[in-house]
From Swiss-Prot:
CDD domains: TMPK. Phosphorylation of dTMP to form dTDP in both de novo and salvage pathways of dTTP synthesis. It catalyses: dTMP + ATP = dTDP + ADP. The lineage of its organism: Bacteria, Bacillati, Mycoplasmatota, Mycoplasmoidales, Metamycoplasmataceae. GO terms for biological process: dTDP biosynthetic process; dTTP biosynthetic process; dUDP biosynthetic process. This is Thymidylate kinase. The keyword Phosphoprotein does not apply. GO terms for molecular function: ATP binding; dTMP kinase activity. Pfam families: Thymidylate_kin (PF02223).
Amino acid sequence: MFISFEGIDGAGKSTIIKKLKRKLPKLYPDKKFVFTREPGGKKLKEAEKIRKILLDKKTNIDPMTETLLYAASRRVHLDSLIWPALKKGHIVISDRYVDSSYVYQGIARGLGVKVVKEINDIATSNFMPDYTFFLSISEEESIIRRHKRGKPDRLEMSSKDFFSRAYEGYFKIINSPTMADRFILVNAEENVGTILKNILNEFDKILKK
């Protein structure tokens, strides 16, 4: 089973996934969980090199090049980590996947979801998550949290308009008839304990199917 986590920057995905990394193996000792993230991937040298290029403040590339680099990194991620883990029967949980490209490059950068999807369909061999948790926060809360973090990377330094387009873009993707079924919406403006509890309840439903 492959599960991705999505959300606008500041939604708290990384924080929640760290907690799931501790909780899930204890709650389901008979299952093997593999946690990873994009761009890059757990101990994947080639994908991590691409990550450094993408997030480096000094990198100056156009949206198409950015999209192709994300797709290349994603292919390495799939081929070297995700697919081998799934073949072993493991449950793979990834912090971001193709939806991030649809939103950030397709909508916020203006390339168009159709173009970005075509590129990623080739790169991923049309491989999609079984479930996607979307951590939802308001645009205003996203701004507050991003400012608190400090030390922004290249993507995080993008304009307010860029993030506004990304925010709206996520809801376009979520409400798309071809994608809506796999999304699980989570109110990420609750306290961390409540968010974690709600997500664990959803995991319990998923893993009992």
